[in-house]
């Protein structure tokens, strides 16, 4: 068997997320069907992260096995031919060791969350960012973010449906940068809980609006209670940008 590692980008707006589900269109389904159409082989695609409906990706990584050797550039061309109508594309493909696993071999995952912060919405960024009309205090948001860096129990920021065995995660990066009318939050960790990024963003926005003081983020973290945190930020602003191995 030959194992192939692919890097994928997609607009998640009209998709049900990464994972194959009955009755809806998912990224996994689109790619598995595309691979079958050119290879004639039924494959199971393993992704480095399971993005939710509406979440986008720039650097999602996945792997699959084929019984025959194919040139990587031909795989890219073939997958993109069948997947492009769904705003899903592959931009890299390479042979990988049979010991490689897109999910379990990963050492770090990186996300960006985009906020358009101006009085009027952006037509160009419709469904590609969270529009917030009231001014956000980025400096105070960054101060609050510092409380979340490092290894913590992130129960307050996990979805009630989260299936992770442990709420303990290590946040290695949480930077907030304002560029003109756009605010970008950069988050990195070896792995994340379900909705963890979006719940952190929703809470930091309350700080940015001066609804909360920066220090309240520490209290939320220590509460270990989802009800203590802010709302879940919209999926449209979230981008899965990179996986490291």
From Swiss-Prot:
Any GO MF annotation of the entry: RNA binding
Enzyme class: isomerase
Binding site for substrate: 111
Keyword presence, tRNA processing: yes
Keyword line: Isomerase, tRNA processing
SUPFAM superfamilies in the cross-refs: Pseudouridine synthase (SSF55120)
Gene3D superfamilies: Pseudouridine synthase I, catalytic domain, C-terminal subdomain, Pseudouridine synthase I, catalytic domain, N-terminal subdomain
Chain coiled-coil ranges: none
EC number assigned by the record: 5.4.99.12
Annotated catalytic residues: 52 (nucleophile)
Keyword Hydrolase annotated: no
Described purpose of this protein according to its UniProt entry: Formation of pseudouridine at positions 38, 39 and 40 in the anticodon stem and loop of transfer RNAs.
UniProt protein name: tRNA pseudouridine synthase A
Organism: Rickettsia felis (strain ATCC VR-1525 / URRWXCal2) (Rickettsia azadi)
Lineage: Bacteria, Pseudomonadati, Pseudomonadota, Alphaproteobacteria, Rickettsiales
């Amino acid at each position: 068997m030959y194992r192939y590692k692919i890097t994928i980008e997609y607009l998640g707006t009209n998709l049900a997320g990464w994972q194959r589900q009955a009755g809806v269109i998912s990224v996994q389904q689109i790619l598995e069907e595309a691979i079958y159409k050119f290879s004639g082989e039924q494959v199971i695609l393993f992704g480095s992260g399971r993005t939710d409906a509406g979440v986008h990706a720039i650097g999602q990584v996945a792997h699959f096995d084929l019984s025959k050797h194919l040139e990587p550039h031909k795989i890219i061309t073939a997958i993109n031919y069948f997947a492009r109508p769904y705003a899903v594309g592959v931009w890299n493909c390479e042979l990988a060791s049979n010991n490689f696993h897109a999910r379990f071999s990963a050492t770090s995952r990186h996300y960006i969350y985009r906020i358009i912060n101006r009085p009027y919405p952006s037509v160009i960024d419709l469904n590609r960012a969270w529009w917030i009309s009231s001014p956000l205090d980025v400096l105070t948001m960054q101060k609050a973010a510092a409380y979340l860096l490092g290894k913590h129990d992130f129960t307050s920021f996990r979805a009630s449906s989260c299936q992770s065995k442990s709420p303990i995660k290590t946040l290695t990066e949480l930077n907030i940068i304002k560029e003109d009318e756009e605010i970008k939050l950069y988050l990195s960790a070896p792995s994340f809980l379900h909705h963890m990024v979006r719940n952190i963003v929703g809470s930091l926005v309350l700080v940015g609006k001066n609804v909360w003081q920066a220090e309240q983020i520490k209290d939320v973290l220590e509460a270990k209670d989802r009800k203590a945190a802010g709302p879940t930020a919209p999926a449209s602003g979230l981008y899965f940008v990179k996986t490291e191995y």
